[in-house]
């Protein structure tokens, strides 16, 4: 049962950030498993069970990231990730192809939200066409989100794609879509109540998740 992370877990992630090498990590691997990996998996499993029970038709799965970076993509960085996360999403072949609910823990923050890791141009074209042809469903979602703790984090195009009004312009002109809430690694992070907070957030975000996930069923939009 998830009991919260600990200050030692945050300190461990700082340790990886400044000592990202096998010589530092390997003698401390058991610490990593106890302090970071185990509570991350407990939190993810309990949140997944709750969301999957409420949305049984969605065929969701839980994915907890591994600490090891892809050796083909180190680009001069160390072999270990200094921030870890899990996602709740439907099964897929390409990780950028579907939206997800996520929780992330880093040395200097924790975060949770919903969106794409890296939405494809085709997916974003489908979203823009939805906004053009039937904006009301997304307008309803965005109005509620604008009153919540979550903020849109998608990077905008340097040259806007168009003007669809103040409410949806940030969504229409984004290269990628994600909304999230960031907090300092303290307080509720170190308590069992973190699960309740994140679960409430996930429930609040499910209308957005379902909307984004439904884009996969739209026909390809015309090239712009």
Where does each model-flagged region fall?
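Aromatic- and glycine-enriched beta-alpha-beta binding-site module
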Residues: 72-132
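Long, solvent-exposed, polar/charged low-complexity segments
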Residues: 1-15, 44, 131-132, 136, ...
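Compact, glycine/acidic-enriched structural inserts
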Residues: 106-164
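Short histidine-centered catalytic/ligand-binding loop motif
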Residues: 29-36, 116, 126-131, 190-194
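Sequence-level motif detector for i,i+2 pairs with an aromatic at +2
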Residues: 62, 81, 109, 174-176
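A short, surface-exposed loop/turn module that caps and links secondary-structure elements
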Residues: 53-80, 84, 149-162
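Long, hydrophobic, amphipathic alpha-helical segments used as structural scaffolds
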Residues: 47, 51, 55, 142, ...
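Active-site acidic/histidine clusters and adjacent loop/turn architecture
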Residues: 14-67
């Amino acid at each position: 049962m998830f009991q919260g992370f600990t200050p030692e877990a945050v300190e461990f992630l700082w340790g990886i950030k400044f000592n990202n090498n096998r010589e530092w990590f390997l003698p401390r691997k058991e610490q990593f498993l106890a302090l970071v990996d185990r509570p991350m998996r407990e939190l993810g499993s309990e949140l997944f069970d709750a969301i999957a029970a409420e949305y049984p038709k969605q065929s969701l799965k839980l994915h907890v990231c591994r600490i090891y970076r892809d050796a083909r993509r180190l680009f001069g960085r160390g072999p270990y990730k200094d921030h870890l996360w899990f996602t709740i999403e439907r099964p897929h072949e390409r990780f950028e192809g579907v939206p997800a609910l996520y929780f992330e823990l880093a040395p200097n923050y924790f975060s949770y939200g919903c969106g794409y890791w890296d939405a494809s141009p085709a997916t974003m074209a489908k979203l823009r066409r939805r906004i053009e042809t039937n904006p009301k469903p997304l307008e309803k979602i965005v109005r509620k989100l604008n009153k919540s703790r979550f903020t849109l984090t998608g990077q905008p195009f340097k040259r806007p794609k168009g003007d669809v009004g103040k409410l949806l312009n940030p969504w229409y002109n984004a290269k990628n879509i994600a909304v999230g809430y960031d907090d300092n690694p303290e307080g509720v992070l170190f308590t069992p109540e973190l699960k309740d907070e994140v679960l409430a957030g996930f429930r609040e975000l499910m209308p957005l998740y379902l909307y984004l996930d439904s884009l996969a069923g739209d026909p390809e939009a015309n090239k712009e």
